[in-house]
Amino acid sequence: MRHARMAIGKGEVVCIPTDTSYALVADAFNPVALDKLRAARRMQDRAPLSVFLPGIPTLNALAESVPEEVEALATEFWPGALTVIVRAGETLAWDLGDTAGTVALRMPANRIALELLSETGPLAQSGAFALGQSPLVSPTALAKRFEDSVSVIAAAGDEKTGKSLSTVIDATSLDSPQGKLRIVREGAISSLEIFRVVEADRFA
């Protein structure tokens, strides 16, 4: 973990396991590191990046506001395979790409990921796989795929990681009187599980 932490501090890209799949991460507040992350994933220059965070208190620090529905979902499903899109705090000194003032946040349910996040703070992230392809789960395959663009690959060890995707919920419309949540992508957490926490009529 020390090598991963040091690499992040130097503005490098690191590959870490999560509860859904391996992810490439970099310092969310370092524009050079973000460029390296996009290059590793072969993304366009302004492609938006999402953010891993170490806990719910960081959600409150990064979001302009946290609607009660988002707080309820985070309390129930974090750490876990839930990504929430909220309005980003206006004073944050970062540039995550063409996000229109929003940020996608998740607290992964993986000991290795959370240990790193507890030491580094929020990390920009993108899945360690090419668009349209299945996530890579072997450190050997990851090393071969990202050998020229990733400084450290943290093996999952006895931590479970898979090939699933997180469920993504957009809460950015809740700042208007008639605004509703929207399920952008149904992944590892089903809509039925979501509706047990927040009633279905709160969704568009």
Q: Would you name each region that the model predicts?
A:
Residues 1-204:
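Active-site-adjacent structural elements in enzyme catalytic cores
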